[in-house]
């Protein structure tokens, strides 16, 4: 199971989870036993929904008003940042994005890649779409974590 892109939602769920928590998320709550991880991987969408569920747990615990999200869109590779030998970056750096809404933030970053004039985006878009990566954003919106609607405000 791979999340497709490492935005705010992926990092809030997988990034801060313990080993048992990461296993629970990757298996869509089938097991917390890391030894059983690769024998119990769920359908891709179930994994992506599990990431959204984990995000909701974090937000419910910390409080929506206490969290600011920042995505650094640089060194954009087709591989997960957890890969010890990731593929080289495919695109030029896009920039920094910030929001109090993780759903809007990840949607904006996804759109920035898709709409980029950079020819290196092709491999990233193919990877994100082949893994249905936007589904985490859809699932998080359905859980009430935010809205996919956003407005970009450039600071310079």
Feature annotation, model-predicted:
Residues 1-156:
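Extended, low-polarity segments enriched in aliphatic/aromatic residues
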């Amino acid at each position: 199971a791979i999340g497709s892109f490492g935005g705010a939602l992926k990092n809030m769920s997988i990034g801060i989870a313990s080993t048992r928590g990461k296993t629970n998320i990757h298996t869509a709550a089938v097991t917390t036993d890391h030894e059983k991880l690769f024998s119990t991987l769920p359908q891709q969408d179930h994994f992506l929904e599990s990431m959204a569920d984990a995000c909701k747990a974090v937000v419910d615990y910390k409080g929506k008003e206490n969290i600011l999200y920042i995505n650094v869109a640089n060194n954009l590779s087709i591989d997960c940042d957890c890969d010890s030998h990731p593929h080289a970056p495919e695109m030029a750096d896009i920039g920094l994005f910030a929001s109090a809404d993780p759903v809007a933030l990840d949607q904006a970053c996804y759109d920035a890649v898709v709409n980029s004039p950079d020819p290196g985006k092709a491999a990233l878009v193919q990877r994100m779409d082949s893994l249905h990566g936007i589904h985490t954003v859809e699932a998080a919106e359905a859980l009430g974590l935010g809205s996919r609607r956003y407005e970009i405000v450039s600071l310079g």
